[in-house]
């Protein structure tokens, strides 16, 4: 998320505290962070911690290959209430600009596009709602 590190931190906090086992954060330059736990639920502490971590380089395709079920949250996706969600799946969130054309072409082949409806949501709101839906399924 360009120039919105605060939103990224909120997304990570909401995802992990919502019960997600791991969060991949992939930046525009390909730097990727794998987060499986947090040192705190306070945004400032999480931000410092994230900045101190060493990123690794990978591709979206390599991450997708690790999962049987892949979902892309997009405004043009199928209504989430009609989808059969896999709690062990990979859920991909973009920012308000969306993903690159290349990434969306890859996801058109390898992911089910799902939507929370016509209302745009911040990614961290969407993460919290998705966590709620997945917990309700169990």
Swiss-Prot record:
Cystine bridges: which residues?
Answer: none
- One GO term of the cellular component aspect? cytoplasm
Binding residues for S-adenosyl-L-methionine: 73, 94
According to the UniProt entry, its GO molecular function terms are: S-adenosylmethionine-dependent methyltransferase activity; tRNA methyltransferase activity
Keyword S-adenosyl-L-methionine present in the record's keywords: the answer is yes
Q: Sorted alphabetically, which Pfam families does this protein's record hold?
A: Methyltrn_RNA_2
User: Keywords, A to Z?
Assistant: Cytoplasm, Methyltransferase, S-adenosyl-L-methionine, Transferase, tRNA processing
In terms of InterPro entries, this protein maps to: Alpha/beta_knot_MTases, TrmY, tRNA_m1G_MTases_N
Stated family: Belongs to the methyltransferase superfamily. TrmY family.
Q: Which PANTHER family has this protein been placed in?
A: TRNA (PSEUDOURIDINE(54)-N(1))-METHYLTRANSFERASE
Q: What does this protein do?
A: Specifically catalyzes the N1-methylation of pseudouridine at position 54 (Psi54) in tRNAs.
Q: What is this protein called?
A: tRNA (pseudouridine(54)-N(1))-methyltransferase
Chain's gene name: trmY
């Amino acid at each position: 998320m360009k120039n919105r590190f605060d939103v990224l931190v909120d997304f990570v906090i909401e995802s992990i505290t919502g019960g997600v086992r791991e969060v991949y954060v992939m930046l525009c330059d390909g730097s990727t962070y794998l987060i499986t736990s947090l040192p705190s639920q306070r945004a400032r502490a999480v931000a410092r911690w994230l900045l101190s971590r060493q990123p690794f380089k990978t591709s979206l395709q390599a991450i997708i290959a690790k999962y049987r079920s892949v979902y892309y949250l997009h405004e043009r996706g199928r209504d989430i209430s009609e989808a059969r969600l896999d709690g062990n799946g990979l859920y991909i969130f973009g920012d308000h600009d969306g993903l690159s054309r290349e990434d969306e072409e890859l996801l058109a082949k390898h992911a089910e596009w799902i939507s929370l409806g016509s209302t745009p949501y911040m990614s961290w709101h969407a993460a919290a709602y998705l966590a709620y839906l997945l917990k309700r399924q169990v």
